[in-house]
Curated annotation (Swiss-Prot):
GO CC entries: nucleus
Similarity annotation: Belongs to the GARIN family.
Protein name per the record: Golgi-associated RAB2 interactor protein 6
Residue pairs linked by disulfide bridges in the UniProt entry: none
Stored InterPro entries: GARIL-like_Rab2B-bd
One Pfam short name: GARIL_Rab2_bd
Origin: domain of life: Eukaryota
Amino acid sequence: MEEQCMLPYYTAQSSPAMGMFNTSMGKLQRQLYKGEYTIFRYAPMFESDFIQISKRGEVMDVHNRARMVTVGIVRTSPCLTLPDVMLLARPAAVCDNARCGPATQKTDSPPAEILELTRLLPLMFVKITIHNSIKKQLHLKLATGRSFYLQLCPPSDASEDLFVHWENLVYILRPPVEAYSGTKAILAGSTSDSSVFEEVQRSPVGYAMKFCEEKEQFRISRLHMNAEMFGSTYYDYTIEI
């Protein structure tokens, strides 16, 4: 309870995304709050669990188990009125030699689920659409043309329809996407307007975005904030592609 109270609420009162960021804290946000990735520790986040499906809505399974994905939508800077980053995470191995000793492995209590943060996607390079509103399915299309289909898996104790927030997100992110302090959305490979890129690089994901011309997603090795050098809205990224 104390952790949730210490997290900031979404403060951009004029933003249409304010409601979704004032929802309860999810497991990915709780994990990031512990400080592994400093840039995301206090960032407002909206997240949901999904299963990956095919275009026809069939569940894509691995070893007879549904492929679970946690999708987090993040606003990384207070100067932005709209979210700018999508995070993807998956369940990690709960116990291994590096994390758990023999004493831990012998306990009968169920271990807490650990998420592995696997991808950082600037939202200006992701097109999110509703694939099937009745079945609560999303279609994610990356700048390279690669597509993914996801079906919402709301918690059993959910007190509201979480898919409404995703529908709202789709609406507010429709082009032109003004997620970077008034700059317009640009597609990967469109590098003719250097002034636009200069403005975009002022956002926390500016360094990461330069890789989007050739890569549609990033594997995060390490993220840390260098506040003394760049100030409160500039971040130093180390990203493994």
